[in-house]
A protein has these predicted regions:
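Nucleotidyltransferase catalytic core that binds NTPs
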Residues: 1-178
Length: 178
């Protein structure tokens, strides 16, 4: 693969993200990493785009230089959003997404693959950001779900405490709503 792109929220970067990002950087000459929901900060997006960018850099920068971070705002308009992403990322050999809606939007523009078809089985980690945020909100172990450097950053920067104060109760309440 030459140019690969993806857009995720990275809230926070977890071990599943790390496995995907490392695999893409190993297999691609250039990886364009979209920081989705860059214009949102709420219970589903509790970390700023700059904070998410720092998490990705902590994971990738010690080993790779073939990646670029791109801010991708939400537009609340799928067709406009896909056109924006295409404009920001340009031509790609591959676009990667786990999100069915994003897959539908991007398939007319790119060859699209699910991360599960790219990450080798021995690296696959079944974690999502919702699980990490729920554990943070409950005060349970979340550190084992994220790369060590990310855990240290989240704690040292006071981001876990801030998340718990600002969005902890809302995160827990979301579990109760079907």
């Amino acid at each position: 693969m030459k140019r690969t792109g993806l857009v995720c929220r990275w809230k926070p970067v977890h071990l599943g993200h790390e496995a995907l990002l490392v695999t893409l950087c190993e297999r691609s000459s250039h990886v364009l990493i979209g920081l989705g929901s860059a214009n949102r900060r709420n219970a589903r997006n509790p970390f700023s785009a700059a904070e998410s960018a720092r998490m990705i850099e902590l994971v990738l920068a010690p080993r790779f230089r073939n990646f670029e971070l791109v801010l991708v705002p939400d537009l609340d308009d799928g067709p406009r959003w896909s056109a924006l992403v295409h404009g920001l990322l340009g031509e790609l050999d591959l676009f990667v997404t786990e999100n069915a809606w994003v897959r539908e939007l991007m398939t007319p523009l790119y060859t699209v693959r699910h991360p599960g078809t790219i990450v080798p089985p021995e690296r696959h980690v079944p974690i999502d950001g919702t699980l990490v945020r729920r554990r943070m909100a409950r005060g349970e172990d979340w550190r084992s779900l994220v790369p060590r450097a990310v855990a240290a950053y989240l704690e040292d920067a006071g981001l876990v405490e801030r998340f718990q104060k600002e969005f902890g109760l809302e995160t827990l309440a979301r579990e109760l709503v079907p």
